[in-house]
Structures are given as C-alpha cells and as structure tokens.
C-alpha cells in the first residue's frame, strides 16, 4: 500500500509536468487518489490511463466539465500511446520512436519520452553493473533523444534518474539539440552530469555555457567561441579532460568524425 501511495504521488507529479497548464493542489491530490483507487480495483496489477480518467472524473462535481488534469488524461487515452501489456524488448532490440505526428512541445510527445524513459529506468535498476577492464567498459544500450530541448524544459525526473542509474550499468545517453543553452535547465544540471559534451557548429553561442563546460574566461573564452563558429561539417569541439584536470594548455580539442555511434 505504501509503495502504491508513493507511486501515485510520483505519477500525479508526472502528469502535471507534461503540460504547462496551472494545476491546483486539489487537482493534484484528486489525481493521486484516483491512481490509488485504480490500483485498488486491479489489486495492484498495472493500470491504464482510462482507469485513472474514470476514477478521476468520479471525484468531480461535474464529470462532463474538463479541468487541466482530465484534459491531459483524455489526450493520453485518445491517442492510445501504450499497449496494456509489455510486448517490446527494450534491451535486446533497437527501436526508433517517431513523434513527428505530435507537437514536439505538447503533452503527448512529452508523455511518450517520459513514460518510455521511466520503463528503461525500471529495467536498468535491475541489471548488474557494466563489465569493466583496464582498457574497456561495457556499453549495453544507447538512448538517443533528438531535439532534446523539448524534453529538458520541464521536470523530467525519469531522464534525470536514467542519467544517474545508467552511469554504471552500461547505458549511453545522447541528448542532441541545436541550442547549447537548452541544457541550462532549472530542474537539473545537465552540464555537471555530461561526461562527454560534444559541440558542433552553433547559431547561438552562450558565454555562460562555455564557462560552465570549459572553466574559461577572457581570451580563452573568445578563442573557443571562434573555434565553434568556424566548425565545418563533421567537426566537433570536446573538452580535453587531461588539460582541464591539470589546468594546463587548451581546455578543448577539435576532432573530425564521420559518425558518433
């Protein structure tokens, strides 16, 4: 029961995070209660958005009148995003999730990423640590999110948790965006947790980001700005970990690649 109560609070926070609409404390509490009621009716078995919506509406004075929560739930139900049972092997198979049918900054696209990443969290928490030798570490899985800025501007807890969990489980997470400032999220310090920041040519170069990544200012800052602005196709700027640690020489390297994976 305690686990369900905790999960109901987390799920309520998740649904609230998917939309920018203002959600009152009463709505959030009502949603948590609806989730708990749904689990009671399934005796702890997995629940669906339809069940949550039905139980949520039963707590409204006028079930026909939508509020912010019921509106989100109806969108999730209407779009039939997920199966009622697991049929995909997210570890041993490769999937491309196409989301171009949905507005990238809307609740449906966010829900797809949010709950898929949540599922990966559950899987990776159960795995043994990655194999490590003197020369190599095991990479089990790549999770790549293109146009990631749409997924960084809200409280995306599963993504934060996956970054933390994946570090010693052989998970590589690649967050790709055209604007380096997108990683300066108020919800999470993505730069502090980025082991290998890769910078391609940028239309907008943010000084505060360069300072955070490379620990530079003044002439060194301007030098890196110039290098980024002059990057050609396939060229990247990366942090020189050795120079950064020793505080010697240039804090960056310029490399040329044909592909990243």
Q: Where are the model-predicted features located?
A:
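P-loop NTPase motor domains
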Residues: 1-171, 184-187, 227-244
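P-loop NTPase motor core of the ASCE superfamily
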Residues: 20-30, 183-261
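A short linear-motif detector with a strong N-terminal bias
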Residues: 72-79, 175-179, 214-218
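Hydrophobic/aromatic beta-strand patches that form the interior of the parallel beta-sheet core
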Residues: 95-97, 174, 196-198
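Active-site-proximal loop/turn and secondary-structure-junction residues that shape catalytic pockets
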Residues: 101-103, 179-181, 204
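Conserved H-loop
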Residues: 168-171, 176-183, 201
């Amino acid at each position: 029961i305690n686990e369900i109560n905790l999960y109901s609070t987390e799920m309520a926070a998740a649904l609230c995070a998917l939309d920018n609409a203002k959600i009152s404390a009463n709505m959030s509490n009502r949603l948590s209660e609806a989730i708990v009621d749904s689990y009671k009716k399934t005796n702890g078995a997995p629940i669906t958005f339809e069940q949550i919506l039905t139980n949520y509406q039963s707590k409204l004075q006028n079930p026909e009148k939508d509020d912010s929560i019921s509106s989100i739930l109806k969108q999730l139900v209407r779009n039939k995003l997920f199966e009622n049972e697991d049929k995909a092997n997210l570890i041993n198979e490769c999937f491309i999730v196409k989301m171009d049918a949905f507005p990238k900054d809307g609740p449906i696209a966010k829900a797809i990423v949010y709950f898929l990443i949540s599922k990966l969290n559950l899987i990776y928490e159960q795995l043994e640590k990655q194999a490590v030798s003197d020369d190599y570490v095991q990479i089990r899985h790549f999770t790549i999110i293109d146009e990631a800025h749409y997924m960084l501007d809200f409280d995306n807890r599963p993504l934060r948790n996956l970054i933390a969990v994946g570090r010693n489980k052989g998970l590589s997470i690649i967050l790709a965006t055209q604007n380096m400032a997108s990683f300066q999220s108020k919800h999470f310090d993505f730069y502090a947790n980025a082991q290998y920041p890769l910078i391609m040519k940028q239309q907008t170069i943010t000084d505060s980001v360069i300072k955070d990544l490379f620990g530079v200012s003044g002439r060194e800052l301007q030098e890196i700005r110039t290098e980024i602005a002059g990057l050609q196709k396939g060229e990247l700027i990366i942090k020189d970990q050795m120079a950064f640690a020793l505080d010697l020489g240039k804090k960056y390297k310029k490399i040329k690649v044909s592909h990243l994976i």
